[in-house]
Amino acid sequence: MHRLIARVALFSSVGCALPALANEADGTVPRDIDSAFDGDYLILGAGVGYAPDYNGSDDYTLRPIGGFRASISDMRIFSSGVGIGADFIPDAKGARVKFALGPVVRYRANRTGKVRDEVVRLLPRLKATWEVGVTGGVSLEDIFHSRDSVSVRAEVRWTVAGNQGARIISTDVSYFTPLSRAAGIGASLGVDYINRDCADYHYSVSAQGAAASGLPTYQAHGGWKNSTARLYGGYDLDGNLRNGGWGIGGVVSFERLLGSAAQTPMTALRGSRDQWFVGFGLGYTF
C-alpha cells in the first residue's frame, strides 16, 4: 500500500494533478494493486508549478519542479520540498500500522533572486539556507475500505547554513484513497511553527531596509507561520498502477500565512497572506 501511495504522492509532489476521477463502475480496487512495487523501485517526475514569487507575495511565477522516490533494501529515499529525506524503518508485510523515521535535508531560497515587486526588491537580498533535521510519522491502513490510509507526520529542521539558529517544526495529517486500478487521490492539512531566528531572518524589516524601500521597520517574532490545505491526485497512463510506467497527476495547495509571516510589511502592505500553489507534471516508475 505504501508503494501505491508513494507513486501518487510523487506524481503530485512534482505537480501532476488532475481533477478527481470518478470511481469505476464496480467501485472495487484489487488487493494486489501495488504488486509492481514489491522489492526495489524508482519513481522520477518532472513538471511545472505556479507559485508565489516569495513567501507572502501576491505575484506568481511559473517554475520547473521535480521529484523522486526510491526503495532500496527496505530503505526509502525521497524528495522533500527542495531537498531529500529518508525512512529507515522497514514495513512489516501485511501490517495495518506502519512507522517512518529518518533524516531530512532541505534547501530554502526565499527572496534570494530577483523579486518582481518594485518595493520589496529594494530590500537586501537574503542568502539561501540549508536545513537539516528529522522526519517521522505513522500511518494506519484500511480505514473506511480496503486500501485507503490515514497518516500523521512531524518534521523538525534546523538551519545549518545561511541563517544559523533557525528552527522549523512542520506537522500534517493526510488521507489517501485509490479510486480504481489507475487512479488515486489524497488530501492533507498541516501547520508550520518557526522560532524567532527564522522569523527575524525572513520577515523583519531593518532600519536599513526601511530606508531603502520606504516600508516601515518591523521586528518579527517566532510562532505559527502558516496553515496549509492540499489536494493531490495521480493517474497511470496505461490504466494500471500495478505495472509501473508513465503517470500524470498534480497538486493544488492553499496556504494561509500566520503571525509574523502575515504581519510583515512585505506581506501585509505589498503581498497577500493567502498563498496558492498549483502544479502539473509527468512521472515514470522503474
Language-model regions, residue ranges each:
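Cleavable N-terminal export/targeting peptides
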Residues: 1-38
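Short loop/turn motifs that connect adjacent beta-strands in outer-membrane beta-barrel proteins
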Residues: 23-40, 56, 75-99, 141-150, ...
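Residues that define the transmembrane beta-barrel architecture of outer-membrane proteins
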Residues: 40, 60-66, 97, 126-132, ...
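Flexible, solvent-exposed coil segments and beta strand-coil junctions
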Residues: 44-49, 69, 111-117, 148-155, ...
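Transmembrane beta-strand segments that form the barrel wall of outer-membrane beta-barrel proteins
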Residues: 44-52, 76-86, 117-121, 149-160
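Residues on the lipid-exposed face of transmembrane beta-strands in outer-membrane beta-barrel proteins
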Residues: 46-50, 66-72, 84-90, 103, ...
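Extracellular loop and loop/strand-boundary signature of outer-membrane beta-barrel proteins
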Residues: 52-54, 87-89, 118-123, 156-160, ...
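Outer-membrane beta-barrel transmembrane domain signature
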Residues: 160-247, 254-262, 267, 284-286
